[in-house]
Amino acid sequence: SPDNKTVYSNVAENGPFENFCASAALAKAYLVYKEEDNVFANWCLRSAKEDFEFAKVGYEQGIYTKRWGPNIDSQVCGHGAIAAVELFKCTNDSYYIDVAATYGKTILACQQSTDPDWDIPLKGFFYEDKEHKWMLTYEHRGHEQSPVQGLCMLCEVAQNHPDYQLWIKGLELYREYVLKSMELTVPYG
């Protein structure tokens, strides 16, 4: 047994965000290994699908880990879209595009899409939630890229989806936010 008792203070938990991250990584692994080691690749794909479903159902049921607290919609849905697109690339199953598109709607609902009544109005950034209560920010390990990466990946694989132009608009708003932020942070931007 380990001498360091802190090992036991971080128990394994089943959370949607963690499962979406694992699902995306395992789907990528399937694509990398499918020609080289079919047995391992197929295990990766099965595990990716299982982790994806655990995450999807867990998010729908409001399950979250004690360690990190309640789900952050834009982050979880961003990684949900990423995992779904990675699984679509592996399976070509439109189910994953449908689920990713649902997460895309939530991502866009978390985005500031109009000019707020501020001295210096900014739009295009993301909130944690659809109610726009808390801005999506991190002070240590960050996941601000999750919503944008999820929308980008959706655009790559689903150009004919009815929400495609909405995803593009969301990405354009984020670009506007980054450019405006650069102006406001000169000489650092």
What annotation goes with each model-predicted range?
Residues 1-189:
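Glycan-recognition and catalytic cores of secretory/periplasmic carbohydrate-active enzymes
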